[in-house]
C-alpha cells in the first residue's frame, strides 16, 4: 500500500507540475502576441494600468478559459513520457491495475477542476470588471449605450416600455407603464421622456396618467414627476461581456430576475453559467482520454500521442464554440449546448479506456 501511495504522489506531482508548466509556457507566448497586436493601444495607456489592470487580470482569465487544453496537453505529455520510458509497463507488471492507475489522474483532475470552478465562479469575474474597463477605455469600446423597443415586467402585473434609451444623457423616449389586475388594465402612465436619476428613481416628463375604474376613467396630466420604477439601465443595456463580470451567484440571480421580467436576450448569460460547470467537468473527461490514449508505448515516440492529443483538444474547444452558437440562435437550450461536447467526449473516453493496455 505504501508503494501505491508513493506512485500516487509521483503521478500527481508529474501531472500538476506539467500542467502549470504548460500554462506558464503558453501564457508567455500569448503575452508576446497580445503585446504585438495591441501595442498602439498599450502605448496610449499608463504603464501601471497596462500591467496591473490589464495583464494582471488577463492572464488568469486566459489560463482558466483554456484550462481543458492545458490539462490535456499535460496528461498527454507526461504520460507519453512515462510510457516511452517503460514506466507504465513497469507499474502494470508490478501488479497495479490500469483502473488503480487511474486514481492519481482523477485526483489531479479533481484538484484542477475545483481550482478552475472556484476561479471562474468567484475570482475571475471581479477581475474581469477591471480588465474589460481597461479594454473599453484604451483598446476597443464595446459598451452598449443605446437600446430600443424595451419591454419589461418590472413587477407582477406591471409592464414598462421604452421606445428608445440613450445612456449618454440617461434619457428614455416614449415611455409607458401599464398596471394590470388579472389581465384587466387598471392604470396607464405615458411620458414623452424619462430620465434616470439613481437606483430605481426616475423622472417622467410631459406625462399623462389614465386610471380606469370600471366604465369610469380619471385623467391626470403634468410636466414633470419623480417616481420609483424598479428597473435599472443595466437591465436592458446588455453587452456581450457583461456575463463574464458576474460571479456565479450573481449570474444565477440575474438570469432568474430577467426571466421573471420577460427579457429575451439572456442567452449569453445562460451559456456562461453552464459553461463554467461544463468546463470543470471537462477536466475529468479529457484526463481520461489523455491517459488512455498515451499510456501505450508506440514506435513513433510520444510525438504521435501529442499530435493526436492536440487534435482532440482543439476539436473539443471548436465543438464547444459551435454548440454555443446553437444556443444563441435558439436551436437548443444553453445547458444542452454546453454539455453536448462533454457527453460525446465521455463516449470517446470510455472507448479509449477499454482499448488501453491493461
Give the location of each predicted region.
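Small/flexible residues
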Residues: 190, 205, 212, 277-278
